[in-house]
């Protein structure tokens, strides 16, 4: 993990293809905040435990905060990290000052009748060559430019996490719908989402906003994935 800056603690739960190196995305904020970015299970130096569920990932985050003697944080969940950030806020509201969801996975407004068993980067693309070979297709299909693709490399240090996101984290809010009672959330929430985001479904986000008890929804007409 990376722990940098001073001020209010911003605990970043990175998305797919991420890791502690995503601190670079927030380097201009380090003069105002203490930013902590841990690698989630299977990403950049973090092992993959037998229980790789969102709930167990939250347990690992709590252990880290206890080690750092940090009582409460602002949670910043982005992309696939949104599921874990939401789970964290539901299970440990006493440790959360506020929840920020940025171009992220969203809970369902109603329990879905079906869901995919794998929702993420196909396994054959979870390597440097595969990602490089198909790099030009990501912009029109997913809104991810070459610079973003380059920031994901090397894939071999993120592959286990990417597959776990697709097989476990990204489907958990559908598979275990009742474990995400958003209407009981006790923390203030800020959601930022672009309508033209090709990765995080704007309509799903918009439909679920009313379930958040205390939520501000920032909508951008354009900006795409991660604005």
Q: Where in the sequence are the language-model features?
A:
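Conserved alpha/beta-hydrolase "acid-adjacent" motif
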Residues: 198-204
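Conserved acidic catalytic loop of the alpha/beta-hydrolase fold
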Residues: 56-74
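Alpha/beta-hydrolase
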Residues: 119-180
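Conserved hydrolase catalytic core segment
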Residues: 71-110
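Short beta-strand/loop motif that positions the catalytic acidic residue
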Residues: 185, 191-193, 197
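Flexible "cap/lid" loop of the alpha/beta hydrolase fold
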Residues: 99-128
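Conserved HGGG/HGGXW glycine-rich cap/lid loop of the alpha/beta-hydrolase fold
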Residues: 2-45
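Catalytic histidine-centered segment of alpha/beta-hydrolase-like enzymes
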Residues: 199, 217-227
